[in-house]
Amino acid sequence: MWSKIQGADMWVHIPDGCWPDRADELDPLVRPGFDSAARVTLPKFGAVLRERLAIEDAIADVFDSVDVLATPTTAIPAFAAEGPMPREINGRRVHAGMSVPFAMLANIWGSPAISVPAGTTADGLPVGLHLMADRHREDVCLRLARVLERARPWPLGARR
């Protein structure tokens, strides 16, 4: 669902005459979203939007009873910055974006979110804590992140 919504949104920003002539300039992770969105019919897009609204309603229900959702920043340990994003998690093939499912949830909902350092794995890889607040409550994310970072500051230098 997310790739179709994101792909449709990207189409809004493409100047006429740029697609597909410049498709090779897109990141390999981004291009499938464009290709997928180009094939989505209006009825299918309507179904995707209804699915998004159902997710938004479910998230709104959660924020009726909590101020913050705290989750891992990623679903897996850190991977190389130059990529690619992993295509397998716990032996199961997944869309590359599923390494960051909680960020995707915040993007669908349109809510503020922030990631703060939370320690390291047994192998010394960084682990983040993802904080997500209700819509228009950036102050909640920022205040909590400030408290957490003051309590456990991240080291300023890299270690080997």
Model-based region annotation:
Residues 46-47, 57-60, 65, 107-160:
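Structural helix-boundary/capping segments
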Residues 77-78, 138:
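Short, acidic Gly/Pro/Ser/Thr-rich loop/turn segments
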Residues 100-103, 135:
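Glycine-rich phosphate/pyrophosphate-binding beta-alpha loops
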Residues 60, 84, 103:
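Short glycine-/small-residue-rich flexible loop motifs, especially phosphate/cofactor-binding loops
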Residues 1-8, 85-87, 129-131:
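Short low-complexity, flexible loop/linker segments enriched in glycine and/or proline
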Residues 4-60, 76, 115-118, 122-125:
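Short helix-loop capping/hinge segments that flank enzyme active sites or metal/cofactor-binding pockets
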Residues 5, 47, 79-100:
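Short, surface-exposed loop/helix-turn segments at secondary-structure junctions
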